[in-house]
Structures are given as C-alpha cells and as structure tokens.
Amino acid sequence: MTTAPSEDLLTLARWMAGDFSNQKQALAQPQTFAHIRVFFRPLPFAFFGTVGFYSEQTYDYDLWSPYRQGLHRLLDREGGIYIENYGLQDAGLYAGAGHDPEILATIPTDCLQPRRGCAMVFRREGDCFRGSVEPGNHCLIPRDGYWTYLVSEVELTESTWVSLDRGMDRETHRQIWGSQAGPLHFEKREGFDPPLPPLGKGG
C-alpha cells in the first residue's frame, strides 16, 4: 500500500508550486543581478506516483529559452524531505512548459535522466523550509575545464524562494562558478495548484 505524503511534504509542494521572480532585486542592483524567472509547475500525480514538478529557470526577457530545466520527485525519508532531481532527454522540446500547460502535458516519463548525488534535502524550520544538496559532494558538474561539485542552499517560505548555487573544485574546494554577490531573492508572482495523491491512497 502506498504511504500518503506527509503534511510537511504537501506544504513544501504547495509553497514551491508557482512562478517566481527576482524583479525587485534586479531593479535594485541591475549591474549585479539579471531579472530571472523560476517556474515550478506541478506534474500529474501519476507521473512519478507521488508529488512531482517540472521546473525551468529563464531570463525574463526570453521566457521561451530556459537555461535550466529539470524534473523533481518529492519523497519523505528519514532526516527530511528529499527532492530527487532529473534532467530531460531532448529538453529543448519542452522549453516553455513552465508557463504553457499544453507543452507540460507532452513530457513523457521515459525522458528522465537521473542526476546522481544531486538530491536536495529539505527540513521544516518554523515558517520556512531550508534545503541543501545531499551529503557527499557527489553532484558533479563540468565547468570551464574543471570537475566541480554543486553546493546549493535554499530557503523557501509561502511566498519567497531564496537560493544560492555554487560550483566548487573537487580537488581544491575553491569556488569555480556561481554567484559572488550572494543569493538570488525570488518572490512568488503566481501560485499553482500542487499535485495531490488520489483518494484512497495511503494509510
């Protein structure tokens, strides 16, 4: 029998589901921060058999050319809520799915490309969730001739998403890429209804 998602997982999903923008930050510091949009669009519950999302990150001036796309599966585990991260085969076919539900509906389950070692672990802390990459420094990303591991820190509230991603050299642990000016501060422009388990599941 399938275990129903926890209340914390459903709350995390509800807060994640939306269209986020760092417009205020970009206007206040235009030489430092570009105006970025982040979409977390809920997937049908049947896609993963649990709560899941499609995401894309794109510059506000070109919503049809995301520079980051992913699929995300939310799971209750000991120690927190795990968000497994996946790439998409032929991701360009689904560009724009963050703001176009018709494109979202075309994403097949067989396009998943697991990102090993790249799960995010979230824990509830009062009126927010804090997340970071699973331990081990195994989320590897090639960049500028180096193999780097991802260090990602996220704080999520009902209306905000604050994130800082950095790539660290595997050997020296010095920063190779990512923001030098601090985290990106996003505010939710629009919320989306999160995916819910079908009636009769759980127990």
UniProtKB/Swiss-Prot annotation:
Enzyme class per UniProt: lyase
EC number annotated for this UniProt entry: 4.-.-.-
UniProt keyword Lyase present: yes
InterPro entries noted in UniProt: CpcT/CpeT, CpcT/CpeT_sf
Entry keywords, A to Z: Lyase
GO molecular function, one term: lyase activity
Function of the protein: Covalently attaches a chromophore to Cys residue(s) of phycobiliproteins.
Family stated for the protein in its record: Belongs to the CpcT/CpeT biliprotein lyase family.
HAMAP family according to UniProt: Chrphore_lyase_CpxT
Record-given protein name: Chromophore lyase CpcT/CpeT 3
Gene assigned in the entry: cpcT3
